[in-house]
Amino acid sequence: MTDIHQHLWPPAFIDALRARAEAPRLDGWRLVLPDERPYSIDPSDHDPARRAAAAAAEGDERICISPAASLGLDRLDPAVAAELAEAWLDGALALGAPFAAWAMAGVLEPDAAALRDALDRGALGLELAADVLAAPDALERLAPLLEVLDNEGAALLVHPGPAGAQDDPGRPGWWAPVVPYVSQLHAAWWAWADGGRERFPDLPVCFAALAGLGPLHGERQRARGGDSGAVDPLTFVETSCYGTLAVDAVIRVLGVDVICHGTDRPYCDAAPLALGEAALNAIKIRNPGRLLARHPDKVPT
């Protein structure tokens, strides 16, 4: 089985975050992000042996890790973002099995050569912030990166970007994951639907957290003049932080063949899904395998 959405920071990446004088940075085990309340990190959450043991106990044989686009590292000065991307990938690849790594990239000056090198070194694909993909000019601005993925058949993981000032201290701790993160994913889902597949026909893309339940709004989109209809076999969603009710609802819209298993550990644990054996096999084994196979359009569903 494959979990396509976890976060585990290797030592080199932790050191790089601690070396920063400005947010986003780590102060010891205290995460400081621009305009957001500080967040205390449990060191054991980034212990590779502990994480691997937990995965093995649940039957996960491959754990796909990313730094988390919600840190906002992609929008730093391009040279700084590139250094952090290198520190991330060096450390993540050094972990070895059962871990596999998503690359990160700066978005102010997208570097196609650096992404191509990351894929050559073993990165699964690219983690991209949902708020970046949702921007009106995103497909044009991100074209250097998306073209690399499209040509290689390598996957794009769309993950929430920073909550920023919406993570107000007066709000409960669950506010950012439930409100700004979900709304970003919802917007990114429909931004991709509006021309993404036409421009990048071979790019497999997976939206975290069921794309903020964006797929459930197809009826409304069509009622307002849209033309969403046929399911795109290369546009996937993963299940992190959702249970049977939401997953079943999305399956009714998209079918089971584009639903992938993801947990968002260490921030969520996998909710047991009350689905049939065939559906669980598709979600946990077949679909992640197809997503992460280069050129999944050539892999039978």
Outline where the language-model segments fall.
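Short beta->alpha linker loops
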Residues: 105-107, 209, 241-242, 283
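Mid-domain alpha/beta scaffold segments of enzyme catalytic cores
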Residues: 1-132, 140
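Flexible, glycine- and charge-enriched loops at secondary-structure boundaries
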Residues: 41, 78-85, 178, 182, ...
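Catalytic pocket-lining loop regions of alpha/beta-barrel enzymes
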Residues: 120-254, 258-260
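A short acidic (Asp/Glu
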Residues: 75-76, 217-220, 272
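Short glycine-enriched loops at secondary-structure junctions
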Residues: 107, 160-164, 266-267
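Mid-to-C-terminal alpha-helical segments outside catalytic/metal-binding sites
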Residues: 2-4, 10-62, 90-91, 212-213, ...
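Secondary-structure boundary/capping positions in well-ordered alpha/beta enzyme cores
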Residues: 98-99, 203, 257, 295
